[in-house]
């Protein structure tokens, strides 16, 4: 046993047990674990470690650290107030300051514990890995730190207290957002993670170790995994449990040979001596439909080569899916907080000077905190020389680093010299915006700011700051004027309190009689009205509902159609005459006699223009719609009244029958009354159908008409007959009578209102009306007519219907009035910036006013005295007025002559004269010289810095209220690492989705030319090796990460952002297909995509501190990259668009090459895990996953067979699964091939005799019996020995096994 003398924490414990297991097998290590457990419990019991509140000690230096942070922030705030930095830069600086303070405090907490109380229970728990971690301890005894608001934006006030000190109410509320978010998140995460595992299992369930060695010479190049300069996974850790694909040479010495498996010692040795190693990998394994033992390497459960029949696919799926719950799912946008882990900071060790080395070229930049600095374009050295004696220091700076000291500058101790950005790290930026609102009301003034108009495709114009500059807001009280108010003062007027600034007049357009109740909000003006002065209105109720009836003086009754107290439009029907003169008893045919109607519609009726007679030929119509067999009479038959014509239907009058039928369905029966004459010779009668015969005419010999008749010839059952149908006449007058009405009309306005009487017919000339009970032919209506100068105006006018009480006769009369309603605005007092508002009404009830008269006026009065400014009379109405009050001005008296002049804008801190400094920013209004000296009048103001490209919400000279938005600053912010993390990113990768903002990849190798254009866009060209120049369009929000004259390789990133794996595959395939042929190019392309996916998935898990072995991810990625899409089948049987395994199509193509047929052409494809699952060979497995119906119908149509190779299809059918012991069936088929190569392989693994697949080499039987007798029950059996204790030979020997195979074959 080796002796360890160090503190054993959780990680150490893991290592200890793993060491015991590796060297002494499972039985011994389980006993070690058991003993450790006893030891642990014994000491835990003795120690009784628990946390009491006294254990939470806050480091004493905390106060000082917070003070220095606040001091730094105050300096920043002052710079912001002076307009030196923008809102964004202030925010960034505040956030960064608090972030670094929080980090320093965390380190201080650890230091404090270590030095003062190393046996502190909190410290022991957190650092032994028992419970809790640093970030939790920090919240207990450090500071809670910055929190995000519900939108994910960081709040720039951190929680400075910790849980030991306790939170204030505000802090508690702020901190509870994050807490709730965490709970919700965990719930969502579990579900997502479970679904991911399910998909992974489905895609990889049929990956089983089926062979010992596929014999491939291919391999995967493994290097340490880095992010910039930081090593995420060391090379040694990545190699553990892999098998080498090539010998590893150090100089001339071979330190490890091909096909050797790498244990911990060898891994460490290789990791120290070489940078990269070729290893066997599931990705390059050539075993058909499985993975071979050499390519997979160790089974991580046992630390030995994997057994045959091991279901490595399922192990891989669970290894990737299970930690999914630990990944943070929804990532919080941290509002641009960017911790300084990317940039390494160089601080001056002491007082000294800075020199730039040769070849260092820079350009001026403004840092994200608004400081001027230099960005390195070509790398070089930064040399620091101490002022006194001391050693020179040389720092190498990379392109993209920021220098804070110019060449030759003298620097203080701890001054920041540079921020060196790590070599290409996965740092990306995004565009973000921030609103800047004003802190005071006043007048906007642009200083050195040029606004430019941009119009987008939709025609919206935005104003953008072309160059950066300052927006000043000059202080003053701003009054919002209500709509329609006109200012009555001008710029420069001096006003006192109560002076009227503006007034709104309420004007009547038409004039008329005023109706006004005091305290009401409306003033109505009657411009025209009409009264039915002779008629009275009574309320009657018929059939359960009430209605109004108008009784006129001459005895007519009109039914009121419009409800009182409502508005009606022009030409609306107000009332309808109640009369039954035009009521028929049956249906029939209508003919006009001399009547003319205006155009109209069936709904509203046709208005009678010229009177005359309505002629009505009655007939009785029954709509039946029954089977023809129910008909009792025949077509043309003459029946008497009361006859049954169809079963259960009787006619009401005598007449000739007409039957209308269609497809043996009886549609309708018509009974036409009249005199029916048979045995008539048609040649003797000169009348045709529908002719009208006047009274007293002899139609037939002996038949004379007594009244008006209409002729109709009928084919009856007894022959041809003549029917003389009666015709009823209804006279219609030219002008219907209208009731008497008196009206007041405004003649000047040209408005006239009256009720006109109109007659309307509802049926056209010659129309047949089907009815049994009769219809109403004509109705008389009262219609509202409003006449104005123009037709357009009349259409929009409406009249109010009112019932007016007549005092003398004690009844109600109908009155229609046209009102002009004017609303008094009494709600204006609610606007805090509106000034004092008074409204006065200038009319009383019953006044007669002329058009254009002012009815009421509202005055806006000034609240304080001052001078009027900011009225710009132009095209638009004046909406705001500014008053410069005394409190907006500051008077400064000086003895000496000031250095400032009138109209100068000065920021706080500027000198007016030697020794006199401005306390506030402002505009110099006047400089006066008096007897005592000079007097400067300063109008207070606030400058706001605007960065280039910001969107301006205001124009020069606008008036703004406090809190109005001035500009929208557009800035780039670093995406924090956590945005592209967690489950969503894993899912995006494994489903092979295209990322939202993919980066641009170079399609061929060459040299870059990068050009930054005027409009902030970047032009990137690559001059390829054959001289071709290709352009790469760069979108606005993409950042170029290559520099001018940099050499790029095929598939290299030109801009930031995640790569699109599909594009990566395509780029490599297109580049190599002409050089190396389709198969090789497909392999290279797929390998590039595979490497990308494995590394990306690893980096997500690594960033969360989860270790997963590469081989698991490789098994899954192998399934995603196994297929190609056929483009052209050639002479093979494959169809275009079919997905086929790469190896399969290549075998077919090799056969084609031998027979001379045309090979199939194909493109490699990358399938997401869901797609790959649905495209497996086994349709049973695919159908049990998703889209069952589609998969099964397709399989049935195509006549597929399922070879039951995977686990899932066998489980569904209920067979033994081909993994573990069930694998023997498969093993027997390949047994013959294993016999010869067995020894060498097992010895190569250093296992020889104790290989668990070696079934033939068994010790003789008697050894087992003899040994077992001596086994002591207290003896600990080691695995390695236990393997020798195999059971007695199975019932069948090797020969019998052979016979069994023969039987199977039969």
UniProtKB/Swiss-Prot annotation:
Keyword Cell division attached: no
CC cofactor note: Binds 1 Zn(2+) ion per subunit.
BP GO annotations: DNA-templated transcription
Enzyme class: transferase
Keyword terms, alphabetized: DNA-directed RNA polymerase, Metal-binding, Nucleotidyltransferase, Transcription, Transferase, Zinc
Quaternary assembly: In cyanobacteria the RNAP catalytic core is composed of 2 alpha, 1 beta, 1 beta', 1 gamma and 1 omega subunit. When a sigma factor is associated with the core the holoenzyme is formed, which can initiate transcription.
Function per UniProt: DNA-dependent RNA polymerase catalyzes the transcription of DNA into RNA using the four ribonucleoside triphosphates as substrates.
UniProt protein name: DNA-directed RNA polymerase subunit beta'
Source organism (scientific name): Crocosphaera subtropica (strain ATCC 51142 / BH68)
Classification lineage: Bacteria, Bacillati, Cyanobacteriota, Cyanophyceae, Oscillatoriophycideae
Gene expressing this chain: rpoC2
